[in-house]
From Swiss-Prot:
Main location: nucleus
GO MF: DNA binding
Residues in the signal sequence: none
SMART domains, per database record: B3
Compartment(s) where it occurs, according to its Swiss-Prot or TrEMBL record: Nucleus
Name under which the protein is recorded: B3 domain-containing protein Os01g0234100
Basic and acidic residues: bias regions: 268-282
Ranges annotated as DNA-binding: 152-243
Length: 495
């Protein structure tokens, strides 16, 4: 039974630890249930749904009246957006907001088990005040687009830009204007830069490439995006920011970083509470520098990975200094040692293209890095192969690995051909001692060597004999010459 009177806030005696502990447990339970509702609301098809919010009013503390607002996206069809949803275990009331005086009139609806907290679901006017500004501006932009360019408006959800990085498109729009098969669709931003994405005709949504586009353009939950179809496979994208989102929340994946920074800043503020105030001019300059650093964090390297400034063709690579390994809009040079990156640069130069350019979409970044790295290792192994360093089994493993990479879209045909050429060489035993003929020839050579040694020994003996004979002959010839000389001397003596 409804009672037309404000909810009476109840207090507890100060210092009641038991009560506070119970209250903390109940609040944890409430947040868990709200998180479950939030996780179940991330549907890709959100064309006819609108965000809601739940406000938890908890009056349990000893002296302070606390109103805690817990944002929650409860996706409800427009046909029933004025109807009230029931959150299990949380009391429900209907909340009507008075815009003239800023007060809120609340009608309480008793729910079984009600004791501590009240939950409110704002009506449509409150929802529009919460997140309708961006949608309204998007619709205004859509009305000003050329009539010959079909368009649609998309409200960004958690599953679009945070967890899934998958963007489902309106079925009616896809059936009427987009191809039925898988194809590449170009997204042109407001600066005229083009970004390639993969459109899945069967699922009617953008997959690979949308992640890099969303991160690079700081698209956040609550933003509204207008897609203007300017050609068969090209959208011009207009991004309308949700003014309720702080600049620090613009960087996907950095929430925990900012939370940590916030806690650190709060601690420093407490420690410096007694310090004298700084000069106002210095404070303004420091604030500006901090703001610039916050904005630059979006484009800083996360674990060494940074965003590519533009789509790069291999024709633009003039030298190793401007060679980058880009996958899905992310520069992943940091994943490779310098010598491996140089080897990959040489391989790409030999083929005059990026070897990974045609890899299948939706491959994980870890898998892509592994494929490129193993390709580099195989190329280095082929270069270093020799008769005693690489076996037949090594080449067979490399061949199977390269064949699997080829199926994934990696350009490794030239490496496969090189491996096939090596495998096509006549097979020879690695160790000649394993060949029987070699052993026979070795034994025969040994025997021939022994014969040579025996003959050489005989030759030495013969040479000695020849020397002795020569000496004796010389002695005999000398004796004959001496006798002839003596004879001629006597015969020719004077009378």
């Amino acid at each position: 039974m409804a009672i037309d009177q404000p909810i009476k806030k109840r207090g507890r005696p100060p210092g009641s630890k038991n009560t506070k502990n119970k209250m903390e447990q109940k609040m944890e339970l409430v947040h868990q249930r709200l998180a479950l509702l939030d996780s179940s609301s991330g549907s890709d098809r959100d064309d006819d749904i609108g965000p809601r919010a739940i406000i938890i009013d908890c009056d349990e503390d000893d002296t302070d009246d606390v109103m805690e607002v817990v944002p929650l996206k409860m996706l409800m069809p427009k046909e029933v957006e004025n109807e009230q949803r029931t959150v299990p275990g949380i009391p429900q009331t209907c909340n009507t907001q008075n815009t003239s005086n800023g007060r809120t009139n609340t009608t309480e609806v008793p729910v079984k088990g009600q004791n501590k907290c009240a939950s409110y679901l704002p009506k449509k006017s409150s929802v529009q005040a919460f997140c309708g500004s961006a949608m309204k501006r998007a619709q205004e932009i859509q009305t000003k687009l050329p009539a010959e360019h079909p368009s649609f408006v998309k409200h960004m959800l958690h599953s679009h830009v945070v967890s899934g990085f998958w963007l489902g498109l309106p079925a009616g729009f896809c059936n009427k204007y987009l191809p039925k098969h898988d194809t590449d669709i170009v997204l042109e931003d407001e600066n005229g830069n083009n970004h390639n994405t993969n459109y899945l005709g069967g699922k009617q949504g953008l997959s690979a490439g949308w992640r890099g586009f969303a991160i690079n353009h700081d698209i956040k939950v609550g933003d509204v995006v207008v897609f203007e179809l300017v050609s068969t496979t090209k959208f011009k994208v207009h991004i309308i920011r949700d003014k309720n989102i702080s600049p620090t929340d613009r960087a996907p994946g950095l929430k925990s970083f900012y939370a940590c920074k916030k806690r650190k800043i709060s601690k420093e503020a407490t420690d410096n509470a007694t310090k004298p105030k700084e000069d106002p001019e210095t404070t303004r300059v420091s604030s500006k520098v901090a703001h610039d650093d916050t904005q630059n964090l979006v484009h800083e390297a996360i674990d060494g990975i940074r965003f590519s400034d533009s789509e790069m063709s291999f024709d633009d690579v003039m030298s190793y200094s401007n060679f980058n390994i880009v996958v899905d809009g992310l520069v992943i040079d940091c994943k490779f040692p310098d010598h491996q990156r140089r080897t990959y640069y040489e391989l790409c130069c030999a083929q005059k293209s990026f070897l990974h350019r045609h890899l299948l979409r939706q491959l994980s970044l870890t898998l892509v890095v592994g494929v490129i790295m193993e390709t580099i290792n195989i190329a280095e192994g082929i270069r270093a192969c020799g008769a005693g360093t690489s076996s037949q089994e090594d080449f067979l493993i490399w061949k199977k690995t390269l064949q699997s990479f080829d199926l994934l879209g990696m350009n490794v045909a030239f490496l496969l051909k090189r491996v096939d050429d090596i495998l096509g060489l006549p097979e020879q035993p690695r160790d000649p001692s394993e060949c029987s003929k070699y052993n026979e020839l070795k034994l025969e050579r040994s025997r021939a060597g022994e014969k040579v040694k025996a003959l050489e020994s005989m030759m030495l003996t013969v040479k000695d004999v020849l020397k002795k004979i020569d000496a004796e002959m010389e002695e005999m010839e000398s004796s004959v010459r001496n006798h002839d000389i003596a004879l001629r001397k006597i015969a020719t003596a004077p009378w």
